[in-house]
Amino acid sequence: MPRTEPRVELLAHTPEPLSLLYAAFRQCYHAGFVADMWPRLLSGEIEREKQGAFIASILESGHSSPIEHVSFTFAIEGVSRALTHQLVRHRIASFSQQSQRYVDGSHFDYVMPPAIARNAAAKARFEQFMEDVGSAYRDIKALLEQDGRTGSRANEDARFVLPQAAASKIVVTMNCRALVHFFEERCCMRAQWEIRAVADVMLGLCREVLPELFAHAGAKCERLGYCPEGERFTCGRYPLRQSMP
């Protein structure tokens, strides 16, 4: 059973994302019709810096719903089922995940936690267990096929032995408002190492496309300037709110 590492790629995003956000925000406060200013936005007549500054000023007031008009789509592979179960908890998103029913898991890839990889005895036990699971999957699938359950019908029952470590692939689409919330929760040190690493890569890709919105995105402490998690859960990177003057 081969060990694998995560890979995150940005497949697509809404075209002209900054101008679209600017138009959406402006329409809320503009008596005219923003479609009439759209050519000026695309031509650069309304400068990017001006658009970004206007959006930032409105976001500071707490009005953020217009950022839902822009979305990003990512392809993610080499992540565990444990991660994807955490990922799909973010319900304001769209997901298309690799099926363990239609994809044969006889030689599944797996993800190994770094803490296990650093411990020689734990690593050896983990690797042996992955081999044992793979062997059990193949044996059960073969027995089911002998009973006439072939293809996906055998896979769908044999998959019950696959572990949380089994690697998966998934396509994820989120709008910017959902992404900002996702980064607040999953870039935080309280998030598990695997999903935090994936979130950090996703944030970097978003910043390349739309720095005006994502430059200061990330864990909540990055925006607030203090840790809101309380004394029990703080990582110490930022002071606690109650300790600030």
Swiss-Prot record:
Pfam families: Thy1. PROSITE patterns: THYX (PS51331). It catalyses: dUMP + (6R)-5,10-methylene-5,6,7,8-tetrahydrofolate + NADPH + H(+) = dTMP + (6S)-5,6,7,8-tetrahydrofolate + NADP(+). Its cofactor is FAD. A motif (ThyX motif) lies at residues 89-99. Residues 6-220 form the ThyX domain. Pathway: Pyrimidine metabolism; dTTP biosynthesis. It is an enzyme of class 2 (transferase). The keyword Transferase applies. CDD domains: ThyX. Keywords: FAD, Flavoprotein, Methyltransferase, NADP, Nucleotide biosynthesis, Transferase. GO terms for biological process: dTMP biosynthetic process; dTTP biosynthetic process; methylation. One of its GO terms (molecular function) is thymidylate synthase (FAD) activity. DUMP binds at residues 86-89, 97-101, 159, 186. FAD binds at residues 65, 89-91, 97, 175-177, 181. Binds 4 FAD per tetramer. Each FAD binding site is formed by three monomers. The active site is at 186 (involved in ionization of n3 of dump, leading to its activation). Homotetramer. Catalyzes the reductive methylation of 2'-deoxyuridine-5'-monophosphate (dUMP) to 2'-deoxythymidine-5'-monophosphate (dTMP) while utilizing 5,10-methylenetetrahydrofolate (mTHF) as the methyl donor, and NADPH and FADH(2) as the reductant. Belongs to the thymidylate synthase ThyX family. This is Flavin-dependent thymidylate synthase. It comes from Nitratidesulfovibrio vulgaris (strain ATCC 29579 / DSM 644 / CCUG 34227 / NCIMB 8303 / VKM B-1760 / Hildenborough). The gene is thyX.
